[in-house]
Amino acid sequence: SGSNCFHFEKFQGWNGIAFEPSKIQFEKLEKNRKCKLVNKPINEKQKEVDFFEVEEGLTQMSGIYDDNFISEQLIKNDKNSKFKKIKLLTTTFEENISHETEIDYISIDIEGVELNVLHSIDFNKYLIKVISVENNSPDKNDFKLFFNEKNFNFFDRVGQDEIFYNNKYFNF
């Protein structure tokens, strides 16, 4: 399915929440996922954003359209891709996760606004064990610096994802 969380849900019995603003991708999730699904983009605060919806072709490249949206040229150059820009209202981590305080795993792949969402999480309130984030610019240390401040260590890079673990739970 291309999902970091799918394995844990399907084979380990984990439950969670998936944020998917793309209408096309959300409909696919509804067919094969049991976790809570939210058909909105997640961001650091609730606001209206421009969303780049890829309807055909590179549909996995949809994302919030801002200065950090790195996929635009790739999508526009792909002759099989059809896309449109639409307005969507974002939701926040806190609005959807506030009842949980201990979280085994979070996977964040939101096409360039990962750090915005990470900055909005209260790491003193939520005890998160492992976080993976998509990082299309591995030469930048933004994530490593952020997680170091939160007492997380870098574990590994798998494809475009960097995995960090909380020192409170693991001692390697």
What annotation goes with each model-predicted range?
Residues 1-172:
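Phosphate/nucleotide-binding beta-alpha loop and adjacent structural elements of enzyme active sites
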